[in-house]
From Swiss-Prot:
Its main location: membrane. GO terms for cellular component: cell envelope Sec protein transport complex; cytosol; plasma membrane. It comes from the Bacteria. It catalyses: ATP + H2O + cellular proteinSide 1 = ADP + phosphate + cellular proteinSide 2. ATP binds at Q88, G106, E107, G108, K109, S110, D494. InterPro entries: Helicase_ATP-bd, Helicase_C-like, P-loop_NTPase, SecA, SecA_DEAD, SecA_motor_DEAD, SecA_preprotein_X-link_dom, SecA_SF2_C. This is Protein translocase subunit SecA. GO terms for molecular function: ATP binding; protein-exporting ATPase activity. Belongs to the SecA family. It is found in: Cell membrane; Cytoplasm. Part of the Sec protein translocase complex. Interacts with the SecYEG preprotein conducting channel. Has a central role in coupling the hydrolysis of ATP to the transfer of proteins into and across the cell membrane, serving as an ATP-driven molecular motor driving the stepwise translocation of polypeptide chains across the membrane. The gene is secA.
Length: 1405
């Protein structure tokens, strides 16, 4: 069979993406005047309209991109005074399209992310912004929150300190800032939960990765691992550490290029002697070999201060790319224990992997992935192949003025350090600030010690102490500052310089060693010369640096001869460094690509497991899942019960023993029931019997409310078997390279064996689940099962299950037998089409052949046939050739490994390349989320100036197979514009090599330095041309020139693509105008809450199904293991309950404030006989605004809108809004002006009457002023209490207030002065998240305390609404000041009550 060659359509050049971005940015700039004239309310209305239109599919994000960017730009400018540059809007557009924007350091990437996150947040599906540390997460989230929440776009952040409930609330917001590791671990924990409501992440819609090259490239080799269930045995570690420590250099060999280590023959002999072994590499010694390998790495490859730190009797990992300590991480597979033994710290038990995922697999789960960084062009090919992102370089806002000088090369580190210190001293004397970048903590401490000896002040920022990171970096640009730092990638704080420093030449950056990647060097250089500032950089390297030792050994001797005590900065050494770095980058890419290929197999299995867990957690279809499992279980078991004399019949004794002993646990069936029964019919009957038994058990459980036991059994068995499967897959991965002697690709072997392991895991899950259910001991189960079986076995349905369908059964069975181990499971169907195209290595033939199934297996030979009693022939196969794994251990004996779990669990060549780290779950609580794999594997590259490939939109379909191409078709392919004349392939094989491997695209823009440089002395400085890779020479004017160079058709093509985005005019859109006129608008609120949905706390199954919007499916689905409804949407698409409740409270308060008290409230007040109840009701009414303020608001509202305002709370239950509007409105009986005159007269009359009552002394001081009797109201205020106006009532409360305060205020002051700790204690009790006591004003800061917003009408609400803006002190006078600020009678009353209750509880007088 031959693979059909995909003809990729021609698409635009990379520069055309920039052209489109600039046209969009220009249109946003054109809208500046219009949007700057809008009020906040107008911006909010436009935002709400865009949200509503997207939800109803009126338009797409592409249509409204210009207006959305205009809104975001304007609100950010108003709140922060920062107006986005044109280049930032261009970057936002590139990121929005799902590509990679390379923005030079200091060009405002954070603001760019704000713009694009707002645009995509309009979908209300959640935007995740990933940054490199938690400090930046909180800083940027608060920055965004201030601007966007005024427009109804919520912003949250996710850090390791947050509780699970808070994380869930944060992820429910429209924009969530998080770190990459925390996001990945939350995803894994979500897929280990036992309750679906414990999941914190909603759908994986759109993620923007800041410093994406660091996250997606540098950290791609480090899987995220959650471990648990520790293994107890670690006694061998100290013995092995002692042995490894005694080895000589001849006993082991280090491959510097791959950074691996292994014992030599001499070392193997020593090991066998030390451990008293006959053969070190026998299967029995596998564990010892594994631990020796780890110990070799710990002793001779890893070093304290570089890969890890020893602190407080613990091992802390160090991020090799940023120099930060990786909190909560540890090496897995025993390497952590080997390091602990080496450093003589406490050895912790080795852990079992419970969940794992790589960043490559995780981020491809998102529907849309994009990234930004200052250095990505060198890895453009990898971003395209792995993540399907085109790297687009964004022009700088101002020309780059930094000077990158030629490297200084030294022969030894000793000479290098001397020159580095001398350079620092010389520059420090001029006052120029200096930033020194080192590759390790050890190097930074060497410079620190030397400068300390010279008494030169400086700051050190490394993994040992990074608590003051932001502060240190902030002052690094001041005069005379010297900052020594490990890798500066992702530090996130701009180093700003003053005019004085600019005169001195700006910040001077010294690199003390070239890194493995040119990107890391460029990131260090990029710390100076931001936004057109002057700056300078130079690297000091020696031939003893790690980069030379590992990767330039062939040139080391030649280079050493050129250097003695002097240094050179010649073209020879510069080119050697560049070639060496390119070599390392290529090697690392191969490692990451290899890791991705292997991880893709596991990720497909992971997706099926996680989807199945979701089905179980939903609890809507678990009985159907059980029934599917029974089908698989019975068939697997009973196929082993063939009659020895006639294999087409079942062995009656075996099947009876199976049913009575394993299923029923009591004797019921006899061999006569299954005598002379064909095995396939026996399977059918046994399935019916077991389903009936399980059905009876479920009915019993339902009676005792125990159906959740079934759910728990399903989850426990699935989780346990999945954990075991991960462990087996890890061992298979580590040992698969040892089987290369089979003359097969290790990857193909891994695919085949991994698939077999997964099939075995499924069988084990089914077996253990059904067995566990049948083993449940329930009340009266024997009687009920017996009665049910009697009825079922004697039924006509059971008796009529004759052999009428035997032909169909046997034909299906024959067909099933024919594959003999071929991939036919749901899992295989799910992954085969992808594996064929993406994972199977290409053959070197001219035509690429793809086997129809994976793994490739030979169909067994038919040796004979048998005839059934019903005349059908069943073939018998020769199964003697069943695969077993053979391992030649070097002895004459060949060990047979019966299953994959016995394969070597050690790796002699791979463990050092992928030093996995893991996060230990301290609670060991099993934690699931939708695992939609949006894996898009692009099998072609993008020619830099030629074309991009078409996205692969359907990865589930198998490739089409067709006959070899004709010469004419081949010629058409060769004539495609994707190839230049000199790149035309000669054969189809070459063509596929170019498409599937590489077009030799040179994304590296390095210019060769042709200037010959002579050796220079300390006094002489040599300046070379700046390499193009270190500067952004593209400007916006270049893009204009590019547009001019385009022909008319190309120009029109670009404009046509974005015409809809540019021409969309929101202001003149008829739908928007209608929306604006119809929507309820108020200066304080512009939201209609009628469309919001929420789930009640006690959700029913129907609620959950509606929430997930699941289809009704009763049969197996191809996306799961055992069936169930396939998830179509991820949970938590709606706002969380707290947010909805808060919005409801705000809406209710608005109604109460605008309408004051309702007639019903007033009548209730007047009819209360009990004085205490009446006082409480009045206190509630007093929690309202001044009536004069309300009157003014009402006047403004009426004048502005000239129509009555209807509130949701006004509408009776079941009544429509239109009908409600048609009702009589009492406020419309008179004109507004007439009402004002009448109300004014009533107020004057009322005030006079009330003053007379007070002056006559009708109020008794002994009686609290608020307790107005019904008689007083009737006699003084109005002869008819029911006609009392709202204004009169408010005047009553105003007068009450003055009298009320005099008595209560004194009582409370006295209580608090005698017990000064009371207020503080009460406040801390109400808000446990505050250490001292942070006073909250008007609930504006309440969200930061993670507390629900209180109901303002609740009696204890006062303590959450104190109107003081300072921290509570323990001093009594400060507390007195607090009380004086409280000016509401209801608050005083509640405070006094709370204080008295507190004193009573604490037995104080």
């Amino acid at each position: 069979m031959h693979m059909k060659i995909k003809k990729f359509k021609k698409i635009k050049k990379k520069s055309k993406i920039l052209v489109k971005a600039k046209l969009i940015a220009q249109q946003v700039e054109n809208n500046r005047e219009e949007y700057s004239a809008l009020s906040i309310e107008d911006l909010r209305i436009r935002t709400d309209y865009l949200v509503d239109g997207l939800a109803k599919d009126k338009f797409t994000l592409e249509d409204i991109i210009v207006d959305a960017l205009s809104i975001a730009r304007e609100i950010i400018y108003r709140e922060h005074g920062m107006l986005a540059y044109e280049v930032q809007m261009m970057g936002a557009y590139v990121v929005h399209t799902g590509d990679f924007a390379e923005m030079y350091t200091g060009e405002g990437k954070s603001l760019t992310l704000l713009l694009v996150s707002f645009v995509n947040a309009l979908t209300k599906r959640g935007v995740h912004i990933v940054t490199v540390n938690e400090y930046l997460v909180e800083r940027d989230a608060l920055f965004a929150q201030k601007a966007f929440e005024k427009l109804g776009i919520t912003v949250g952040y996710n850090t390791s300190k947050l509780s699970k409930a808070t994380k869930k609330e944060m992820f429910a917001r429209d924009i969530t800032y998080t770190t990459n590791s925390e996001l990945g671990f939350d995803y894994l924990k979500d897929n280990m939960v036992r309750d679906i409501n414990e999941k914190v992440i909603r759908e994986l819609f759109f993620v923007i990765v800041d410093e994406a090259d660091s996250v997606l490239i540098d950290e791609a080799r480090t899987p995220l691992i959650i471990s648990g269930q520790p293994k107890e045995d670690f006694s061998l570690y100290l013995d092995i550490d002692k042995f490894v420590g005694s080895l000589a250099e001849d006993d082991y060999k280090i491959d510097n290029e791959s950074n691996t280590i292994a014992l030599t023959d001499q070392g193997v002999s020593k090991a066998e002697k030390f451990f008293n072994l006959t053969n070190l590499y026998s299967v029995e010694s596998a564990e010892i070999v594994h631990k020796i390998t780890n110990s070799l790495v710990a002793h001779y490859i890893f070093a304290n201060g570089k890969e890890y730190l020893v602190k407080d009797d613990k091992i802390y990992l160090v991020d090799q790319f940023t120099g930060r300590v990786l909190e909560g991480r540890s090496y897995n597979a025993g390497l952590q224990q080997a390091i602990q033994a080496k450093e003589r710290v406490t050895i912790e038990p080795e852990n079992v992997v419970m969940a794992t995922i790589t960043y490559q697999s995780f981020f491809r789960l998102y529907e849309k992935l994009s990234g930004v960084s200052g250095t990505a062009m060198t890895e453009a090919e990898e971003f395209l192949k792995i993540y399907n992102m085109v790297v687009v370089r964004i022009p700088t806002n101002k020309p780059v003025a930094r000077i990158d000088k030629q490297d200084y090369i030294f022969g030894t580190k000793r000479v290098k350090w001397n020159h580095v210190i001398q350079e620092i001293v010389n520059r420090h004397e001029t006052g120029q600030p200096i930033l020194v970048g080192t590759a390790s903590v050890t190097d930074s401490e060497i410079i620190h010690e030397r400068l300390t000896e010279l008494k030169i002040p400086h700051e050190v920022l490394n993994a040992r102490d990074n608590t003051k990171e932001a502060e240190i970096v902030k002052h690094a640009g001041e005069k005379g500052a010297i900052t020594i730092s490990t890798n500066m990638a992702g530090r996130g704080t701009d180093i700003k310089v003053s005019d004085e420093i600019r005169e001195l030449g700006g910040l001077y950056v010294i690199g003390t060693e070239r890194h493995e990647s040119r990107r890391i060097d460029n990131q260090l250089r990029g710390r100076t010369g931001r936004q057109g500032d002057p700056g300078e950089s130079r690297f000091f390297t020696s031939l003893e640096d790690a980069l030379f030792k590992r990767f330039a050994t062939d040139r080391f001797e030649k280079a050493s001869q050129k250097l003695e005590e002097e240094f050179y900065d010649s073209r020879f050494f510069s080119k050697m460094l560049d070639r060496t770095q390119k070599k390392v980058e290529g090697l690392n890419f191969d490692i990451r690509k290899n890791l991705m290929d292997y991880d893709h197999v596991l990720s497909l299995q992971r997706e099926l497991i996680y989807k199945q867990r979701d089905q179980i957690l939903l609890k809507t279809n678990n009985l159907n899942i059980i029934n599917n499992m029974i089908d698989d279980y019975v068939e697997t078991e009973i196929l082993n019960f063939k009659n020895n004399d006639n294999t087409s019949l079942v062995d009656a004794n075996k099947i009876v023993a199976f049913l009575n002993e394993k299923i029923l646990k009591f004797s019921y069936f006899t061999p006569a029931t299954f005598a002379n029964m064909p095995i396939l019919l026996a399977i059918d009957k046994a399935i019916s019997i077991i389903k009936k038994v399980v059905d009876v058990k479920c009915k019993i459980l339902e009676k005792i409310n125990g159906l959740n036991v079934i759910d728990e059994i399903l989850l426990v068995n699935l989780d346990q078997k999945w954990t075991t499967h991960i462990d087996k897959m890890t061992k298979l991965r580590e040992g698969v390279n040892l089987r290369s002697l089979e003359q097969r690709s290790p990857l193909n072997i891994y695919i085949e064996d991994g698939n077999n392991l997964f099939e075995r895991m499924k069988i084990n899950v089914v077996t253990d689940t059904i067995t566990s259910i049948c083993n449940l001991s329930l009340p009266n189960e024997m009687i009920e099962i017996t009665n049910a079986l009697d009825e079922f076995v004697n039924s006509e349905e059971f008796k009529k299950k004759n052999y009428g369908n035997q032909r169909e059964i046997e034909q299906n069975f024959n067909s099933a037998l024919s594959f003999s181990g071929s991939a036919t499971s749901e899992f295989d169907n799910f992954i085969e089409s992808e594996l064929e195209n993406t994972l199977i290595e290409e053959t070197p033939e001219e035509y690429v052949e793809v086997e129809e199934y994976i793994p490739q297996q030979t169909e067994p030979e038919v040796v004979e046939t048998e005839t059934t009693p019903y005349g059908f022939e069943i073939p018998k196969y020769d199964t003697s050739g069943t695969d077993k794994y053979e391992l030649n251990n070097g002895s004459s004996e060949v060990n047979i490994l019966e299953n994959e779990s016995d394969i070597f669990e050690n790796s002699f060549s791979q463990i050092q390349n992928t030093f996995n780290t893991e996060e230990l779950d301290p609670q060991e609580t099993p934690h699931t989320a939708k695992a939609d794999d949006q894996f898009v594997f692009e099998s072609a590259n993008l020619e830099d100036d030629i074309e991009e490939i078409e996205n692969v939109s359907n990865i589930d379909k198998a490739p089409e197979i067709q006959q070899p191409l004709s010469e004419e078709e081949i010629q058409k392919i060769l004539d495609m514009p994707a190839f230049k004349d000199d790149e035309k392939p000669l054969t189809i094989g070459n063509y596929l090599d170019n498409i599937l491997d590489s077009m030799d695209i040179d994304y590296d823009q390095d210019k060769e330095i042709t200037q010959q440089l002579e050796p220079s002395s300390n006094e002489q400085e040599v300046t070379a041309n700046i390499p193009e890779q270190n500067q952004l020479d593209i400007t916006t004017s270049d893009i204009d020139n590019e547009i001019e160079l385009l022909d008319e058709s190309e120009r029109e093509s670009i404009k046509e693509e974005i015409q809809k985005s540019i021409s969309f005019d929101l202001s003149n859109d008829p739908d928007f105008i209608e929306y604006r006129n119809s929507v309820f608008v108020n200066k304080n609120n512009g939201i209609d809450y009628s469309d919001y949905k929420k789930l009640n706390e006690d959700e029913s199954d129907d609620d959950i199904k509606a929430f997930y919007k699941l289809p009704k499916v009763d049969k197996k689905e191809p996306g799961t293991l055992f069936g169930g409804n396939l998830l179509k949407k991820t949970p938590f698409n709606f706002k969380n309950k707290n947010e909805l409740d808060n919005e409801k409270i705000k809406s209710t308060n608005l109604f109460r404030e605008e309408n004051q008290a309702s007639e019903q409230e007033l009548n209730t007040l007047l009819q209360l006989d009990d004085e205490k109840d009446r006082l409480e009701k009045i206190n509630q009414l007093l929690n309202k605004e001044d009536p004069e303020v309300l009157e003014r608001k009402e006047l403004e509202r009426q004048v502005e809108f000239e129509t009555p305002v209807y509130y949701l709370e006004d509408i009776p239950e079941g009544e429509s809004l239109d009908n409600f509007k048609a009702m009589d409105n009492p406020h419309e009986e008179q004109s507004f002006e007439d009402n004002l005159v009448d109300e004014e007269n009533q107020q004057l009359e009322f005030e006079e009457a009330l003053d007379e009552v007070i002056d006559d002394g009708q109020f008794n001081d002994e009686v609290e002023a608020a307790e107005l009797s019904e008689e007083v109201l009737e006699e003084v205020i109005n002869p008819n209490p029911e006609e009392l106006s709202e204004e009169d009532k408010w005047l009553i409360t105003k007068k009450e207030h003055e009298k009320f305060m005099e008595k209560y205020l004194g009582d409370v002051k006295e209580l608090t002065s005698e017990n000064p700790e009371v207020v503080t204690a009460l406040l801390q009790e109400k808000n446990k998240n505050l250490k001292d006591v942070e006073i909250i004003e008007n609930n504006e800061e309440l969200e930061n305390t993670n507390e629900e917003e209180p109901n303002i009408n609740s009696q204890d609400s006062f303590l959450n609404n104190i109107k003081i803006i300072k921290t509570v002190d323990k001093e009594s006078e400060d507390e007195t000041e607090i009380i004086q600020e409280i000016n509401q009678p209801a608050e005083i009353h509640n405070l006094q009550k709370d204080i008295l209750d507190y004193l009573k509880e604490n037995n104080k007088k």
